[in-house]
Amino acid sequence: MIDVNNFEYMKIGLASPNKIRSWSRGEVKKPETINYRTLKPEKDGLFCERIFGPQKDWECHCGKYKRVRYKGVVCDRCGVEVTRAKVRRERMGHIELAAPVSHIWYFKGIPSRMGLVLDMSPRSLEEVIYFASYVVTDPGDTPLEKKQLLSEKEFRAYLDKYGRSFTAQMGAEAIRKLLMDIDLDKEVDGLKEELQTAQGQRRTRAIKRLEVLEAFRNSGNEPSWMILDVLPVIPPELRPMVQLDGGRFATSDLNDLYRRVINRNNRLKRLLDLGAPSIIVQNEKRMLQEAVDALIDNGRRGRPVTGPGNRPLKSLSHMLKGKQGRFRQNLLGKRVDYSGRSVIVVGPNLKMYQCGLPKEMALELFKPFVMKELVSKGLAHNIKSAKRKVERVQPEVWDVLEEVIKEHPVLLNRAPTLHRLGIQAFEPTLVEGRAIKLHPLVCTAYNADFDGDQMAVHVPLSAEAQAEARILMLAAQNILNPKDGKPVVTPSQDMVLGNYYLTMEREGAKGEGSVFKDTNEALIAYQNGYVHLHTRIAIPVASLGKTTFKEEQNSQLLLTTVGKLIFNEILPESFPYVNEPTAHNLEVETPSKYMVPTSTNVKELFQERDVVAPFKKGFLGNIIAEVFKKFKITETSKMLDRMKDLGFKYSTKAGITVGVADIVVLPEKKEILAEAEKKVDRVLKQFRRGLITEEERYDRVISIWSEAKDVIQDKLMGSLDKRNPIFMMSDSGARGNASNFTQLAGMRGLMANPSGRIIELPIKSSFREGLTVLEYFISTHGARKGLADTALKTADSGYLTRRLVDVAQDVIVREDDCGTDRGLEVEAIKEGNEIIEGLYDRLVGRVAFKTVRHPETGEPIVKKNELIHEDLAKQIVEAGVEQVTIRSVFTCDTRHGVCKKCYGRNLATGSDVEVGEAVGIIAAQSIGEPGTQLTMRTFHTGGVAGDDITQGLPRIQELFEARNPKGQAVITEIEGEVTNINEADKREITVKGEMETKTYSIPYGARIKVELGEQVVPGQSLTEGSIDPKELLKVQGMTGVQEYLLREVQKVYRMQGVEIGDKHVEVMVRQMLRKIRVIDAGDTEVLPGSLIEIQHFNDENKKVLLSGKRPATGRPVLLGITKASLETDSFLSAASFQETTRVLTDAAIKGKRDELVGLKENVIIGKLVPAGTGMNRYRNLDIVSDYDQQAVGTEEAVMEEAVTTE
């Protein structure tokens, strides 16, 4: 018996007529489905029990044999085998066609495969197949040519002239005769010779034909199998017919399509038996051909066959295609048992690794576990009574549930799952009510809020799944964001506000200058109202018990506030006492300016000193990162919980609210606006006199009003009290920003109209004063545009993520070191003088390719093949090194993936990347997830003008799809000097090199970037604009393009304030550049003009070079991500992505084998993915839990029991 779940590869091919007959259990001869009175299947019909198996388990059609004991008996009365009814899902039938028909995929696809094999145009093929023309299949000794088309008239004429000495036929049988006559070897050799000389169109055609013919020759498929003699009929359960509750029947469209085929086939048989006139037979054959076409791919040719209500019927092809097709709906996305969903609410008292699960939900999810436990505790006699107990919710069930649920993690998922942090594991705690409780700190990762979001719960069942959930997916383990390695669980909103309020200082607060003997005394004083949280006090350094103070400091006093004492209690003991929001305080020590001798008059000292700033959101993030660096994950998650509790507690105690009185009115606003009005009038006067153009007038008016708004904003922020609640909220980073405040208290400013052009009439009112009707109307433009954009672009971003995942899903860390001899030189990415991504960011977590030495002393800072961590990167930058060569994904030589050294550190864990990590998918998610932010930026400003960017998502798509960019720059192909810039009539630039001089014409309206006499290098842009990466590939080769794409993608994201690790972009760009176009095949096996993997190309060349023959030549190609996904070696992965029919047609002709190396293919066939714990090296590990795994089987056990007892 073969193991269904264990196979090495999957192969697809054309089926020969005999193969189809061998699959079949019998011929379907009648179009009938079921008998309308008995509702039993008709004999020899589409649902026949004799062909497809019994409808009820262990029961034949006529009822002579019932029960299991007759298993395997074939009934002598009705001929039905007694077996399980589920064989109706797997047994096939067939229809013997009275005339051959062509398979529409091979005849109609682009390019037409049949046409390429026969070297005929699709038009003439269509004429022959659909009985419009005759084709000469054997010219005999007449002057006619083989494959020549003849109309009815010509055929009659030649028949009269030559008699029967030639044969011409029509329909699919003629094509089959031609296909059978083809000698593949002869054709292939002829084409190879033709390729030596052919040029242009002929060459392209020859290459295409050669590809198809080689495919047939190598795969063992016969070209004549593209014509069908026998039609397979799929099992009836896959095209079911069900009775609705009105006595009517609903049936799958396929049954209608099969019925049409059978009807026409039977009619054709009858006509042939009767010896009907040829014109009638031809018409019937054409109708049969059309019926089979509709069955295989309805709507591909001509008008689709429609059902009731003019709805096109879904054919076999449609069953596979698109989001609702077999691939994406059922193979890649399955619904799972043991899952539930509910609304989420905040659970502020949960620990980092916990979630609250509603009791009734938990009971249903853990039902089998509870049942097993009830039996093993002796609370129920057997599984059946246990089930009854659970269903009646008897009180003892809850205690058992509490026990079962301990130590059993569940997965929580929020849609849309944009990155891997969208599913995390938690330990459930039972809660009353019907809402899931979620820890407030994981909201950022899920992008969740509590305005009605819902989340799904899944239960990992097996011991292995539980272990993986606990070790890899527990929320407390996922503190860092995989896209940039920064903490993702930073406190937000209330928590930030509470900690901000707690660490504020205030001059002259109650009890300023008090000195306490230790923290406890200070807290007692605070609780009794002698001092305030913001009071500046002093405390002996020694009483804090911190290990980070120096010896001599222990005898001094520390100047701090009561709030900061409380705040520091949550930090680990060996962490510096945090007294000011600076990096020095975090990383090194508490600054010594806060230490004073015990004899100091503290009160007087405080009067001279300035107030220290409180801790804002960013600084809290830095604290978390620093704690993580020093103490690793467990301590960090504990500290996060303490920080959360502190934040909630003190934001509550602070009682910070927002009232209308908190929005201050700016007295100078009237004057500022009047001044701006005057300026605008002046500009208008100049315009009326014709001194300036309409454009200039518009631009000046816009800039006058923007300036006015900025002045108001600056004055507002200056006049604000530091204790104003709204100011505190925006300053701490909890909510809001300066622009929001200006709109509340100052003026709303300029707005854009729906087309994005700024309306020159500003909104002078603020929300505090209220808008006039016209102003209100103008602001609705921007707000509405924001909402529409968001809705549209979210879909765009999701689709981008899908394409990225698809192109990189098989990139996995495969080995420790690939031993490459190339590295990548990196330096800071700059745009003009502005640094977009510094060298430090580009080095952290990468491996040095060669030793990095100090430029002055020559001392080695980093050795070859050593990982560069934060401190080393800092040293390199401080030493003044500007360029470092690192190991990069670009230069990695590993097959189907990357190696550990070239990838470097795993950003999500902060340690070395493991073999088996699916870095391709992580990269795709890291680039795709911020894609939604790139677009949603317009949404939050309520459409205030000036925030709209042309960059963003469209630019990212342009780069990854390798499209010709808008506003393309002209680049130079040679190195040399700019000798001529002609801007007047011809608009051209001349570059003179050592060997040649080139002149480039400049498109109208392009701004020139170079100056006369400037030295330029190949690939440098001569005009402003984006470079076309395909052009760059020709000029600079692979390295140039890789660096360009990396730089440009980083630019777009960094401009939006999104940080993404370089390595993610590198993984993507590498996938776009892994193919090579063969120019000349040399003596290798590869086909000229074909696209093949670079590594495969190199292998073939090595083979021929070793035997002293001529190698192939090729040039690298840059493919967009969509194209690259479709060009993958795995047909399963490509077919489930896009263009399903084309991919499958192609794969079938080539007889492709899918080796199942990527993740997607394995998900489709239901195997473990070959990444992480699913890799072969881990496959044979057994995880045994003390809690045995019988529980899941109990549901089935109940069912079995129920069946036997009936």
Swiss-Prot record:
Superkingdom: Bacteria
The protein's name in its UniProt record: DNA-directed RNA polymerase subunit beta'
GO molecular function: DNA binding; DNA-directed RNA polymerase activity; magnesium ion binding; zinc ion binding
SUPFAM superfamilies for this protein: beta and beta-prime subunits of DNA dependent RNA-polymerase
Cofactor(s) the protein needs: Mg(2+); Zn(2+)
Annotated organism of origin: Halalkalibacterium halodurans (strain ATCC BAA-125 / DSM 18197 / FERM 7344 / JCM 9153 / C-125)
GO BP term, pick one: DNA-templated transcription
Lineage: Bacteria, Bacillati, Bacillota, Bacilli, Bacillales
Cofactor note: Binds 1 Mg(2+) ion per subunit.
Keywords associated with the record: DNA-directed RNA polymerase, Magnesium, Metal-binding, Nucleotidyltransferase, Transcription, Transferase, Zinc
